[in-house]
């Protein structure tokens, strides 16, 4: 078997109140020790100022003006222009009394003015749409500035992100799984509108290219014919220049990752990291199909091991190594601001305890299962990983948004679902219903029959255990949004807020006959 990471230490069995810990793994490139760091680059300012010297007239920050409710073309600042603004902002902060080394909090949306204030191959272009406080976006921007490359910001509306993509034509796109799920849904919708013959040809080309990818060929060499006939059109929808897609923030399903690898004509990988680990803790390999559904191996300056979570049955020394992911290395944070108690809680003997549950496969590749806090115990004593189930059920075309809920005093799971309007309208047309979408969502034929059967089909396809099946659904017509604080800025469910929201509206989530969310719930 091919190993992708080096094993430095064997696991240790727990005892006397101490949990078992698994083997310690490191990147093969740093098996003999972490490589030396660049002594000239110690801060974000160093990253930026060095690039100003090398690439003063390269485009660095791009944005789109909105005039009379119309979004214009991208406008750009050069490295030299941005440098001048950095000095002005730094001078203004000093004038307010801040001294070198002080902590300065900055609240900002994705725009050139804020990335300048935050100190931030020269031909690459990155589209920034994740919040600047999100480590995935911040890490990518810092890296682009190091290379003298360009960063363009979305114009503020994620629902029409495709318009920014077409205008900017990025070479690199990083996002959370929900973004790539929407790309997948859009492609699937277009496929359904093809005539049967063209759809058959597409599927045949898909399987042909996939077979060569599985034999070890790179995405560019697996089937140039299939790329030319069918898949280049999908690449064009991503701007036509895309070279790399990276998903992070939560697990992306194997099915969607495989689909993107086959059809997008570019490298597609998943990564893993946290703010506390400065972002890139682990990253997959683009042309290794055995890494589908995983986040790859430790980055060069990190070590990873798993720690036992006995009450949940996760054993890092078991046949399948599983447990809480712990990280050690030179890229860890120094501590939480004004919170030494929490710092002490997560940092133990040099290991940062992430709160994430992972598996390490026999080839030493890491897979994320869920967050410890997203694991709940049902009344019969079974633990359920809620976020993992949402990722699985969210693959079904009938689902636009889903929140899976389990009460510890109940033996089954329920869910609130926002159906995909296009899928629902197709279903209604086939059955002869002519009602608007909101009225269709109140039909028992939809929520008590069609949606439940679709979810059951997805559960069977993914070999879920019976207690992981959704037994009842509440249908909501309005997508979960940031405005109601139901999701984070990266579109992750805020579980406590969702529960409070529906409880305050007196929506009975546990019921065998489900109905549409009441009007006072909006």
Where do the PLM segments sit?
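A short N-terminal helical cap/helix-turn-helix that marks the beginning
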Residues: 4-15, 39-64, 84-87, 463, ...
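Conserved AMP-binding/adenylate-forming core of the ANL superfamily
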Residues: 36, 57-118
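Conserved short alpha-helical elements in the N-terminal third of ANL/AMP-binding
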Residues: 121, 133-152, 166-167, 171
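Gly/Ser/Thr-rich phosphate-binding loop
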Residues: 171-174, 184-290, 399
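Conserved ATP-binding/catalytic segment of the ANL
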Residues: 312-378, 518
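Adenylate-forming
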Residues: 331-333, 346-347, 365-394, 403, ...
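C-terminal boundary motif of the adenylate-forming
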Residues: 357, 362, 396-423, 459-462
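Conserved C-terminal "lid"/linker of ANL adenylate-forming enzymes
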Residues: 376, 401-403, 450-522
